[in-house]
């Protein structure tokens, strides 16, 4: 605890933070309180990142509220915030920061499935960000936590939902109690789950899957990809920092995805203490 305490920095430094998610916000908060000048840059128009998207899922409104409160807190402190501002090698060269923290998060994995680029296909992140969603029949590819939350989200909007999972069970990464709670909620919705099932092809109004060696067709007005996430590439930013001799820290989902929120926050805090 002693080594993790916030102490005034011996010298104030300009720190460029790439990404306004929960990790970037935590880094900005800790840096400012230590006496540094953090510049928090977010490529989108709002702060909060994955926490805001997660808050759109059923029973997760607290996530969204926590993200908004954290963002409001650093605004009240006086942290310099730049939305609609992605951090690029050119920006790093122009700002000449003393350090850079990369917290640009993750993006959904899009599998190499014929038809995955069709107009009826949407990433889970983008779906949860939409205000108005309507789909008569929806197929969700992936039965992890995000996939099941998306399924419940769509069912709550009146859609008939089928989840396609290649493993022998869904929600594999969850503890037993959370699995039970999620299954109970799903039982009240129009959600069909197909395990040991592989998506073979996506067409304009149907999805071809294979289960037990047999192909079948699933009617689909909407197909949602929810098979996992991977870090948003940041090697160009890291290389720019290395060439300029600027200390660079990669935290949260930008380092490895997916991460627990507490891990991302802890990494951001530790990075802020290291500067």
Placement of each model-derived feature along the sequence:
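Short, solvent-exposed coil/turn segments at beta-strand boundaries
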Residues: 202-205, 222
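Ferredoxin-type iron-sulfur electron-transfer modules in oxidoreductases and energy-metabolism complexes
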Residues: 1-9
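Short, conserved beta-strand edge motifs with alternating hydrophobic and charged residues
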Residues: 102-103, 194
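Residues that recognize and position ribonucleotide moieties
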Residues: 192, 200, 216-218
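N-terminal Rossmann-like dinucleotide/flavin-binding domain of flavoprotein oxidoreductases
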Residues: 49-97, 172-198, 205
């Amino acid at each position: 605890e002693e080594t993790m305490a916030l102490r005034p920095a011996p010298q104030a430094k300009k720190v460029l933070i790439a990404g306004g998610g929960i990790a970037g916000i935590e880094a900005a908060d800790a840096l400012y309180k230590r006496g540094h000048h953090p510049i928090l840059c977010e490529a989108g128009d709002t702060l909060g990142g994955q926490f805001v998207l997660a808050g759109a899922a059923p029973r997760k409104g607290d996530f969204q509220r926590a993200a908004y409160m954290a963002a409001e807190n650093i605004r009240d402190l006086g942290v310099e915030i730049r939305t609609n501002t992605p951090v690029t090698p050119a920006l790093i060269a122009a700002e000449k920061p003393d350090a850079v923290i990369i917290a640009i998060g993750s993006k959904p994995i899009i599998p190499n499935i014929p038809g995955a680029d069709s107009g009826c296909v949407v990433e889970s992140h983008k779906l949860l960000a939409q205000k108005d969603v309507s789909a008569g029949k929806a197929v969700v590819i992936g039965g992890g936590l995000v996939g099941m939350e998306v399924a419940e989200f769509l069912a709550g909007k009146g859609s008939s939902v089928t989840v396609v999972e290649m493993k022998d069970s869904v929600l594999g990464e969850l503890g037993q109690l959370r699995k039970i709670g999620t299954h109970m909620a799903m039982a009240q919705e129009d959600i069909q789950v197909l395990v040991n099932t592989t998506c073979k092809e996506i067409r304009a109004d149907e999805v071809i899957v294979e289960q037990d060696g047999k192909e079948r067709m699933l009617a689909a007005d909407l197909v949602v990809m929810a098979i996992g996430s991977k870090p948003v590439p940041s090697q160009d930013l890291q290389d720019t920092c290395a060439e300029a001799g600027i200390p660079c820290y990669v935290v949260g989902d930008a380092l490895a995805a997916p991460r627990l929120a507490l891990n991302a926050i802890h990494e951001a805090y530790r990075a802020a203490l290291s500067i």
